[in-house]
Structures are given as C-alpha cells and as structure tokens.
From Swiss-Prot:
UniProt-recorded name of the protein: Vacuolar protein-sorting protein BRO1
UniProt domain BRO1: residue ranges: 4-455
Subcellular location: Cytoplasm; Endosome
Domain of life the protein comes from: Eukaryota
Signal sequence segment: none
Polar residues bias spans: 786-802, 922-945
Source taxonomy: Eukaryota, Fungi, Dikarya, Ascomycota, Saccharomycotina
C-alpha cells in the first residue's frame, strides 16, 4: 500500500549582506578584523546559498551550517550592538500566503531558517518514501527508514520553533500553525510505518497490532483536523460539530512585532484561546486529505480488529467491527473525495486505497454474515456498545539537539567560526569559575598533604620501617652478633675513612717516634762527650734544648692513647678493631645463649614462625600504606589535570541569556564543580582505608614488640647502636688528636735530625781543633805519648775550654784557647765568624719554625733562643788575657724558665729580635767582665755521675 504525503512549503527570502555590520562591530571592539574575514565571508555566502537549495543532503547541510553560525553570533556578539551603525533587515515571505515580513531581529531570522529546515525535511522525506516504494531489498528498506527519520526530525524542528519563538509576525510561524505542522509530520510518520506493517503481514497474523497502529494514525490525523478552523472545514461539508463562536481571527499587524525582545519570550506564557486553530491559510486539499485520512484509518482500525476477532472465532464481534468500518467509509462525503482528487502529486493513491478498502470490507462482511447465519449463529452486539480500540504510537519526535547532522555541523562551526570572539562578561565569569576550581583543588591538596603528614608522624613515632628491619636482622642472627656483620656496614663512611688513614700511617708514626727517642739518646751521649771535653757551656745549652724538647715530646706523646692507637692502626678488618664494637652480651654470654637455644629449640621454632608471620603482616601494612600514598598522589595529579583542562565557556555562553549572573554563580558553578566529586570521593575512600591500616599496624606492632624475645633483641640492638655511636665519637675525637700527633712527629723527627747533625759536626770540629792544637805544640807526631802539663798549665787549659769557652750550641768554634796556642789567621777568624752566624740562624729558627705546626704539634722549646745571644761574643780574644772566671750564678738568667716562657709566648720574629740587636761590640755583658764566682761542681747538675 502507498499513500500521499503532504509537504510543508518553503519560505522565500531576500538577500542580506552580513559583511559590513560584522566588520564595523569587530573593528570597534578588536581594532582589526583581518583574522575574521574568512568567517564573515563564509557566513555571507551561506546566506546567499540557502535561497535556492534543493531538498537533499546538501541543502540540509547549508541550512544547518547557517543556523549554527546564527546561534554562534547570538552567543558571541550582542546583536543590538551589531545593529547600531547599520541595521540588518531580514525579509521573509509567508509560505502559505506569500506575504512579505521584514524585521531586524536575529530571532526572526533564526525562526525562518528553522522553518525552512523543517520544510526541506518534509519534502526530502516524501522523496525518500517514494524511492522506497520503487526499490526493493536493503536499498528500499534504507530509504524507508530515512523517510520516517526525516518526518520525525521535521516534527522536532517545528516543536523547537514552538517552544523558543513566540509572537511571530507571520502566520506560518504562529504557534498554532507550528503545532499543527509538528503534529502533521508525526501523523505521516505513523501512517507510512502502519502501511509498511500492513504490506508485510501477508499471513494476516498481526491484525490486532495493525488495528492499534491504524487507530493511532487516525487519532493523530484527528488532532490535526481539530486544529483547523471550523469555518474552513464547513466549506467542504465535512463536519457537523457545533461551533462555540470563538473563531480564530488573524489580526496581527506588522507594527505589533516591533518589540524584538518579545520574540524571544519563553513558552511559559499563557496561551490565548484563539491560538488553538491554525493561523496559516491552508490549501483546501490539505484539509480534505487530513479529514480523509482521519476517517480512512479509523475504518482500517475497525476492519483489522474485526479480522482479528474473526480469527479468534468471535464472529458476532467481528461482524460488528466490520459493520462499523463500513459505516465509516460510507460516511466520507463525496465533496471530500472531490477535494482530495484536486490535490497535487499522487493523491490518486488515496482514492484507490479507499475504493479497494470499501470493496474489501463489503465482501468480508457479507461472507461473515452468511457464515454466522448458517453456521455460528453468534449474537452481533450493538455498535454503540463496542469498546474503542487502544492506539499504539510507533514513532517519536527527534529533537533538534538529537539530530546527528546538525550536531556534527554545529561542533565544527563552534571550533572554527569567530573562535576568539567572546563577550567580556563571559571572561569575567570564567575567571570567577577558575578561582572556584583553584579553591576546590587547594582543599583537596591540603586534605592529601595532611593525611601524608599523619602517616609520616605515626611511622616516625613507631620508628618504622627502620625498627622492623633491625628486628628482622636480629632474628636472623645478623644483628645480635656484631662480629657476623661487616664492620663497614656498622660505621659511617667518614669514620671508616679516618680509621683507614690512621692505619695507613701507623707504621710511619711508630718509626718516627722511635727515631725521636733514638735521636734523643744519641744527643744525650753527645752531652757526655762535651762534658768530658770540658765544653760545659755548650753541654748546658744542649741539655737545656734537650730538656725542653723532651717536655714537648712528652706532651706530644700524651695526645694519643698508645693502646687505642695500636688498635686503630691494625685496620677495620682486624680482630682488635672489631672487638671495640662487641657488646657485653656478645663477649660474656655466648656459651649460655648457645645452651639456652639447645634447650628450647622447639619453642624457639614456634616463636620464630609466629614472629615471622607478625613481621610479614606489618610489612604488608607498610606496603599497603605506600601503595595508598602513591594512589593518592596519582589521583591528585589527575585532578590537577582535569581542573586545568576544564572549560565551561560554552556553558556560560549558552546560559548567559537564560540566567542572571548570580544564578550562574549559585547554580551552574556548583553544578559544574560536581564533576570533580568522583576524585574527592576516591580520595576520601583512600584516606579512610589508610587510617584503618594505621590502626591495624599499631596493634600488630605493639603485639610484636611486647614479645619478650623481641624486647631482648631490641635491648641488644639499642646497646649495639649506642656502642657504635660512642665508638664513632671516640674515633672522631681520637682522629683530631692524632692529626696533631702525626704532624708533631714529622716536625720532631726533622728537628732531632737537624740537631743531631749539627752537634755531630760540632763534635767533629772539636776533635779537629784538639788535633790541631796538639800538632801546634811541636811535639812531633807522638800525640798519645806527650808529657802531661803541670797543674797550672792544665788548669789554664781547662779554663780555656770551660770558663772561657765560647763555643756556641751551633757546634762551631770561634777562637783558640788562651795559653800559648798559636793565634788563628785573620782569614780563619772571619771564616769562623761566618760559620757561627749561619749556625746561629739555623738553631734560632729551625726548631721553632718547623716544629710549630698548625695542628698544635711541637711547641717552642724553652731557653733555646736565649743561649745564642751570649755565645756570639764569647770567642773574642782580649790582650792581655785575664784569668778565666765564670760569671755569677745569677747572671745565667738567660737560661731561666721564666724568661724562656715569656719568650715562648711571643712570635718567632719577636723572639729573634733581641738576638739580632746583640753585637760582638757589647763587651760589657760578656761573662769575662764579671767577677769570678766559679764553683767547680755547679755544672755537675746535668752530668751523669
């Protein structure tokens, strides 16, 4: 079966130029319109193209694209500002009466564009329906489905116009007309679907379903027919219904539509009673076709319901419904059929269907009456008492927002048309919303950080996981036995480096110390030599130097403990060093612990198993806490990303004309922030789980450390740790003293070597001078057999080497003894004075400068720099030589300790200052000018008995 579909006529329009008004507005706002020229030109071209489109996909895309851009202009540009300089005039013609209507309202332009979209959809649906009747197979099925979809979309377009555009200036845009067209599209969609089912039910197994579908189609056409003015219907003699006198009067005037804002009023306004009738001038064929279909499908509903009852052996009811169907068909007035025939297109299909159905009902009814009279004798109910058939709707309206083609085009235009044009108030609202998001994120981050701090505090208080690792090592026997762990695992790297440095220098330190002691002994032997050779002054000075050096050596050696130094000197891998870190229990209770373990080995196995389980549980809790921490971190990072990428400018633009600023802030913003609630809920869930794990961890940990064996292990571990800390501090302290000790040994070794070398040279000079003096006696070569001098001569010679000996501590001789020896030549005297000055400079600064190290090694020797001043003038020969006399004992103040201590506190430069001022010309201070207080035993104090 095939039907005739009514097509909504399209509206015609005049040309509109968008270029100049848009350029003027954008230039006034942004100062440059170069980047918007493509968008403006494309909009203007679309406006021209829609004037002559065909009813196909291309025409629909052009109209959808133009309407989408109109919506974007309405959202992004205040249209009243756009119309200030040069107003846009939109002229459209009524689709039924062809009357022109002109307005400068953007809403008027959008409403007319939408109307034409609905008209194109209805025409395109008719084309697809006719195509489906000509094609077979999948292609015909696809065309049929597209036809139904387009009729539903057209109904949705008209419904959108009805809800969003009120007080239209033209009759075709009036609310009543739009409602009528929307209902008509739904009726035609239901109709072609019903006919499709009838054509497919060759076995007549769906008569009940078809009856309900036909009833729904009849109801829809009835609604459309009831929306037509009674005066128009009476002209065709197709109704007998009473008329209440409230005829629809179309007295709208163009002047009544000057209010542009009124065109955008919401549909909540109360409808006037006159708006129930169609305002448009409908064609007479439309009215007759709608009425015909209303009656025709009502008849079909009765007919198929009768067939259904006949199949169920309800012959009386079947005869009643067939009779009802026949009455409806016979009730169609001939004038109606005549008006239908005047319609355009394939209206003859309707008349053919009518004739066929009328004959089919008559034949079927006659056969059924005959069978009932002869065979069934079923009672035929009264037609008035027949129950009405329940309608079944098979189609639904497809809204504009659900239109796939429009949605795709709208998304494309939104991202490409006037993208950077955003109203200032939208920017302000976006900034406010960004602050709301930032505050939301800060709250969640604070929640996250506080939870992490709580976990860290708990773990720090419980000393986890470090304490757990210590317990595990203790249970495995690696922590309770200090000697089983490598020593480098117990100590810090700095302590190990210090011990390695001490051990690497230990042999050198011992060698230097022995060298110092041996040198001191050898120098002591030199003192005996000087005493035996009557060089008492030099022996005294040398003893003084040696005494001060010994005192300094004693202080230096006292810096380190030899036993501890020996232990560290053997290195960190030595047994002695490792023994420093053994606790008392390790040293004294090994045997007892072994016996205890052998006695209670079975109990220990059970305890260890239980402890291992507890430790495993605690490790699992710690691992869970770490996983939760990572999950929280990832969740916060994801929340940051989502908040950063969130942009509700589109929503703000769409709602700016519908809601006030306060409504947007109080309603839309909280609603938009709810999209982040899943992150908040997940974070709360993780933190709650985290707190539960912490409580369980505390319980398990307290249970573990309350075990007596664990307590003992912790006690031993704490003792071990304290011992390690104590020994590390002791090593650090020892290392500081050892640096002074090590540097002092280096300086002392050098000093003693120089001192020993000088006095060895001095002894050699004495031997050479004695030999030279003996040769000057002209006794020949028999030096050992020379006759002894008499006591007077011997006394005079002794006085020359004791009282008047001016040999300095440097070890050089500056003159010959008085008593008959040959006088030295002037050249020899000059050479001896140079040697004396050089040796004096060496001894005055060598030890003091080299022995005083930055680390506090050797201190300055007392009295060493004082003996030099007197020795510089001792070897001046005075003619005639006076008797040898020693100065008074109190004149040896240059050797007392008070003076040397005072001089020791001065810098080396100031200590040498008085020595440099003394010259050989100061003869009044020589020991020879003082009265003799010689005591032969006064020098025996330092001599060995």
């Amino acid at each position: 079966m095939k039907t005739h579909l009514l097509v909504v006529p399209s509206k015609k329009t005049e040309e509109v130029n968008w270029v100049k008004p848009l350029n003027n507005y954008l230039l006034s706002i942004y100062g440059n319109t170069l980047q918007y020229q493509d968008d403006i030109n494309s909009l203007n071209k679309l406006r021209q193209d829609i004037r002559g489109v065909n009813a196909d996909d291309t025409g629909l895309k052009l109209y959808y694209s133009y309407y989408s851009k109109l919506e974007l202009i309405d959202l992004r540009i205040p249209f009243h500002d756009l119309n200030k300089s040069k107003k846009l005039q939109f002229e459209w013609f009524d689709s039924f009466s062809s009357l022109p209507y002109t307005q400068n309202s953007l809403a008027f332009e959008k409403a007319n564009v939408l109307y034409n979209i609905g008209a194109i959809l209805s025409r395109f649906a008719q084309f697809k329906y006719n195509e489906s009747q000509q094609l077979n197979g999948p292609e015909g099925e696809t065309a049929f489905k597209q036809s139904i979809s387009m009729l539903q979309q057209s109904s949705g377009i008209h419904q959108f116009i009805n809800k969003n555009f009120l007080h239209a200036p033209s009759q075709d845009l009036a609310q009543s007309t739009i409602k009528f067209l929307s209902k008509l599209m739904m009726a035609q969609s239901q109709e072609i679907f019903t006919l499709k089912v009838i054509s497919g039910d060759l076995n007549q197994s769906k008569n009940s379903l078809i009856a309900k579908l036909c009833k729904s189609t009849s109801v829809l056409y009835e609604d459309c027919y009831n929306m037509i003015n009674k005066n128009k219907k009476e002209g065709f003699k197709i109704t007998n219904e009473s008329y209440d006198g409230n005829d629809y009067e179309d007295d709208l005037d163009d002047d009544d539509c000057d209010d542009l804002e009124g065109f955008l009023e919401r549909p909540e306004d109360t409808e006037d009673s006159d708006n129930r009738y169609v305002a448009a001038e409908l064609d007479s064929s439309w009215i007759s076709i709608i009425y015909f279909k209303y009656e025709y499908y009502k008849s079909l509903a009765y007919y198929f319901n009768g067939l259904h009852l006949d199949a169920n052996r309800k012959y009386g009811d079947a005869i009643a419904y067939l009779t009802k169907s026949q009455e409806v068909l016979n009730g169609v007035h001939s004038s109606t059929l005549k008006q239908v025939s005047k319609g355009s297109g394939d209206v003859y299909e309707l008349l053919d269907n009518y004739k066929y159905q009328k004959d089919a009902v008559t034949i079927r009814l006659n056969d059924l009456n005959k069978d009932n009279d002869l065979i069934y004798h079923d009672i035929v109910p009264n037609l008035v008492t027949l129950p009405e058939i329940k309608p079944m709707d098979s189609t639904k309206i497809i809204k504009l927002g659900d239109n796939a083609m429009f949605h795709e085009i709208n998304e494309k235009n939104y991202n490409n048309f006037l993208v950077n044009v955003v109203p200032v108030n939208i920017h302000e609202l976006s900034s406010y919303y960004s602050e709301e998001k930032s505050q939301y994120l800060r709250n969640e981050i604070d929640h996250f950080e506080v939870s992490n701090e709580e976990v860290s505090s708990v773990l720090e208080y419980l000393k986890l996981p470090k304490a757990l690792v210590s317990i595990k090592e203790s249970l495995r026997g690696t922590s309770s036995k200090g000697n089983t762990r490598n020593i480098d695992e117990l100590l810090s790297q700095s302590v190990i480096d210090k011990v390695n440095e001490i051990s690497s220098q230990y042999s050198n330190d011992i060698q230097r110390k022995n060298t110092i002691e041996n040198s001191r002994k050898e120098i002591y032997q030199l003192i005996k030599f000087l005493t035996e050779n009557n060089c008492q002054d030099d022996a005294i000075q040398l003893k003084k130097i040696l005494y001060d050096a010994s005192v300094s050596d004693t202080k230096l050696f006292a810096l380190v403990d030899e036993t501890y130094h020996q232990t560290l000197g053997k290195g960190i891998q030595s047994t002695e060093f490792k023994s420093l870190f053994k606790t008392v229990d390790n040293k004294s209770s090994n045997q007892d612990s072994e016996i205890s373990l052998l006695d209670i080995i079975d109990d220990d196995d059970d305890d260890n198993t239980n402890q291992d389980k507890q430790i495993k549980n605690i490790e699992d809790y710690l691992n869970d806490l770490n996983n939760i921490k990572q999950a929280k971190f990832k969740l916060i990072e994801k929340l940051k990303k989502e908040i950063h990428n969130d942009d509700i400018s589109d929503i703000l633009v769409l709602n700016m004309k519908l809601k006030s600023t306060n409504e947007i802030k109080s309603i839309i913003f909280p609603e938009e922030l709810k999209k982040f609630n899943p992150f908040t809920n997940e974070l709360d869930k993780l933190i709650t789980n985290e707190k539960s794990i912490i409580e369980q961890l505390k319980s398990r940990w307290n249970q573990l450390i309350s075990n007596p064996q664990i307590k003992n292990l912790q006690t031993e571990t704490n003792s071990k740790n304290r011992l390690i800390i104590s020994q590390s501090e002791k090593i650090d302290q020892f290392y500081g003293n050892w640096l002074k000790y090590h540097n002092g040994l280096i300086a002392g070794e050098k000093f003693y070597n120089q001192l020993l070398d000088q006095f060895k040279n001095f002894r050699n000079n004495i031997d050479n001078q004695l030999n030279q003096g003996m040769r000057s006696l002209n006794i020949g070569q028999q030096f050992p057999t020379q006759p002894m001098l008499n006591r007077t001569q011997s006394s005079g010679l002794q006085s020359n080497y004791t009282g008047q000996s001016s040999i300095s501590h440097s070890g050089s001789l500056s003159g010959q003894p008085s008593g008959g020896y040959n006088q030295p030549q002037p050249q020899q005297q000059q050479l001896q004075q140079q040697q004396q000055q050089q040796q004096q400079a060496q001894f005055s600064g060598a030890y003091n400068q080299q022995y005083s190290q930055p680390h506090g090694g050797y201190t300055q020797f007392q009295g060493y720099g004082q003996g030099q001043g007197q020795s510089q003038t001792g070897y001046q020969r005075q003619p005639p030589p006076p008797p040898p006399q020693l100065p008074p004992k109190q004149s040896m103040g240059s050797y007392n300790f008070a003076t040397t201590l005072q001089q020791q506190q001065l810098p080396p430069q100031q200590q040498q200052q008085p020595q440099q001022q003394r010259t050989p010309q100061n003869e009044s201070n020589l020991i020879y000018d003082n009265p003799s207080t010689y005591n032969p035993n006064m020098y025996n104090f330092f001599s060995s008995k």
